[in-house]
UniProtKB/Swiss-Prot annotation:
HAMAP family listed in its UniProt record: INFV_NEP
Location of this chain's protein in the cell: Virion; Host nucleus
Subunit structure: Interacts with protein M1. May interact with host nucleoporin RAB/HRB and exportin XPO1/CRM1.
Biological-process GO terms, alphabetical: exit of virus from host cell nucleus through nuclear pore
Protein name in the entry: Nuclear export protein
Chain's gene name: NS
Alphabetical keyword list: Host nucleus, Host-virus interaction, Transport, Virion
Amino acid sequence: MDPNTVSSFQDILMRMSKMQLGSSSEDLNGVITLFESLKLYRDSLGEAVVRMGDLHSLQNRNGKWREQLGQKFEEIRWLIEEVRHRLKITENSFEQITFMQALQLLFEVEQEIRTFSFQLI
């Protein structure tokens, strides 16, 4: 797992939490919750790749695993659209930087999850 991605997640979540506390920002609960969920999922997928000796149990759960994977890709697409939308409507430079970094992170994580999933299939 890339330590830069982990610190990027933590940094962006911290920034979004600060933005949420700001009087001018809209409610970011859904975005923050999905970001946290995505981080946990990415981390667990990475751990599964590291423990590839556990393939038998993974194959037993394969149907459910594929369904979860599809759901995560839908969540990533929703997050990308939501972050793009917020980037377009915000005029605050701190928020713009945060959303641009969040967008970049989402693209990186989407690629990482694709790579992990191909290794597990």
